Amino acid sequence: PDLDGGEWYEIARFDHPFQEGTVGSRVVYRLLSESRMRIVYRGKDGRTGRDRISSAKGRLSADYECLRVSSCWFFYSDYTMSACDSAAERQWVVVSGRSAKYLWILARRPRLSTQVLVRILGQVEKQGFDTDKLHFVDQR
């Protein structure tokens, strides 16, 4: 997954307890070596305004198709970049888990145009994801 190089804003996601109620969320993927990454997630609790920050380590597969992420030493989850724009400088990506339970739409800016978002949602639906379950993130 080509996620290195700065900040990505969370446009939409399948909500999970570890992110529920989070607004203004963004993530930074930082390449540490050829196969290792540091991942930092930041957002705010939508009710209290308190910062929510978490970090994880990631390891890229040999073919760079999968990112194995661990937020604690014994538990790993695998993620793939299931869709992205075709620009040399990626402006948006869709990251998904191995199952249909995990999905994030990330972008370089806090908002995407309606035209781009409709195209992304079409691609996501073709891959079998239920877009009705997407939670669109308030980027305050």
Task: Report the location of each language-model feature.
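A beta-rich soluble binding module of mature secreted/lumenal proteins
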Residues: 1-140
